[in-house]
A protein has these predicted regions:
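Bacterial Sec-dependent N-terminal signal peptides
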Residues: 1-28
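Charged interaction patches that mediate protein-protein contacts
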Residues: 20, 83-90
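Glycan-recognition and catalytic cores of secretory/periplasmic carbohydrate-active enzymes
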Residues: 29-34, 59-86, 97-113, 122-438
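Contiguous beta-strand segments within globular domains
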Residues: 31-56
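Beta-strand secondary-structure signal
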Residues: 49-51, 90, 103
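Short, hydrophobic beta-strand segments
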Residues: 91-97
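Interdomain boundary/hinge segments at the C-termini of tandem beta-sandwich modules
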Residues: 117-119
Length: 438
């Protein structure tokens, strides 16, 4: 099954790379915009295809950068035009696998952007994708030694965060101050959101959990690179330690976000001096938190000397969050309603959700996988409908399925497991079919 999922991911990545391939083609040379391919390159034994948006040409040629032809093939016309309505042909040169730097040439059309064929061809891209999280760190300077031309000074230390009236509790009155440092900034603003962090942090934890041997070799050139913890986990820790500060220690509930009242201006982090607020607890945030902490606990348990007590802290926090969610199963974050009742009004990203079935499935699955206590699945309907939705911040059900399947939990314990496996494989097959038929 894992092979199905990895194949699906690889083909989806290929499709995404094709979509963006003409961005770099805007060079004053002989490259042709109608020829779209993976500009980074291909593994020697992998599928290799290029899309030619033209009805011209019959043959295509793989040439060295010195224009020496090393492979020849026939263009195949697509069974249907692309979304723009143009005639689309594709060049399949999967049979060619000699390492080197090449271009694809189609007479009457032109040359492709240069690409490579080599082992580990996507390593630099993969490393850069993970290193991107370092640049999103809040509450720390990014020295030039690690950040290069994107170096900057510290912004948003978040040592003085106000409890918003929507988040008031008996032990934390509105206006009281707490500290909530670290974490990652969100997509285009300087706020920090638990719901977004949930799926993001879990994705990186799963990357390590699924490929531990490889991830231990990945060096990201971050300040923690010389310690004995894999760099990807060091980066996770920057956000995970912030997430732990988002839980109310009194009752286990988790605040939805740490935010300014409104979005920032387009300015560097250190220039923003706006008050920061901890906003309402919610069921979605609390369950996402529980899931991540349970997953983190079983992973960081492998590093007791380097991170003493962290695994225990994570599972304790996860259990406490679960307890709050069970008592408060339908607390939705509705920003418009909050703004009718409280000041200041909060107008940053809402990331609201009104259905928590998927969050309960995910959190319960992670807790079962970590604690081996199947009681967490009691009263949880693992298959509430026939859908197998692709994970996103607002739909995390499949993350729970994937965890259950990867664990050594048997169908004797979880009776729905065979059906979950069947549906997951079918979904992966559909994804592959969609790529192949487009």
């Amino acid at each position: 099954m894992k092979k199905h999922l990895l194949t699906s991911f690889s083909k989806s990545l290929f499709a995404l790379l094709l979509i963006g391939s003409n961005v770099s083609a805007q060079q004053k040379d002989t490259t042709s915009r109608p020829i779209h391919l993976n500009q980074i390159g291909f593994y020697p034994a992998a599928v290799k295809k290029a899309i030619v948006v033209s009805d011209k040409g019959g043959d295509f040629f793989i040439q060295t950068t010195q224009k020496k032809t090393v492979y020849t093939g026939k263009l195949n016309t697509s069974l249907r035009p692309n979304f723009a309505g143009h005639i689309v042909q594709y060049a399949d040169f999967s049979a060619f696998g000699k390492p080197g730097k090449y271009v694809l040439y189609v007479p009457s059309v032109g040359y492709s952007y240069p690409f490579e064929v080599k082992a580990s061809v996507h390593k630099a891209v993969a490393d850069a994708a993970i290193k991107a999280y370092y640049f999103m760190r809040s509450g720390t300077a990014l020295p030039e030694k690690y950040a290069g031309k994107w170096h900057r000074v510290e912004g948003h230390p978040d040592t003085v965060v106000l409890i918003h009236p929507s988040a008031e509790s008996e032990g934390r009155k509105a206006g009281s101050i707490i500290a909530s440092p670290r974490g990652w900034y969100d997509a285009g603003d300087y706020n920090k959101y638990i719901v977004n962090s949930g799926i993001t942090t879990s994705t990186l934890l799963s990357l390590y959990e699924d490929f531990p041997a490889y991830m231990k070799t990945v060096k990201l050139k971050i300040p923690e690179s010389n310690n004995k913890v894999p760099d990807v986990l060091d980066e996770v820790l920057w956000n995970l330690r912030w997430m732990l500060t988002m839980q109310d220690p009194a009752d286990g509930g988790v605040y939805h976000k740490l935010t300014n009242a409104a979005f920032d201006k387009f300015e560097m982090p250190d220039k923003d001096k706006s008050p920061r607020y901890m906003v309402q607890k919610g069921t979605a945030a609390t369950l996402d938190f529980a899931a991540v902490m349970a997953q983190a606990s079983r992973i960081f348990k492998q590093y007791p000397k380097e991170l003493p007590g962290l695994a225990d802290s994570c599972i304790t926090a996860a259990k406490k969050a679960w307890g709050w969610a069970v008592k408060n199963p339908e607390v939705a974050y509705r920003q418009e309603e909050i703004n009718k009742k409280f000041e200041p009004k909060i107008t940053t990203g809402a990331y609201g959700d009104n259905n928590f079935t998927d969050e309960f499935i995910w959190a319960a699955s992670e807790l079962v996988a970590t604690t081996r206590d199947v009681a967490y699945l009691k009263n949880i309907n693992l298959l509430p409908d026939n859908r197998m939705p692709v994970p996103t911040w607002s739909q995390v059900r499949l993350l729970g399925y994937y965890t259950l399947i990867k664990s050594d939990i048997t169908e004797n314990v979880v009776q729905d497991l065979p059906e979950i496996k069947k549906r997951l494989i079918s979904t992966a097959d559909d994804m592959i079919s969609g790529v192949d038929s487009n």
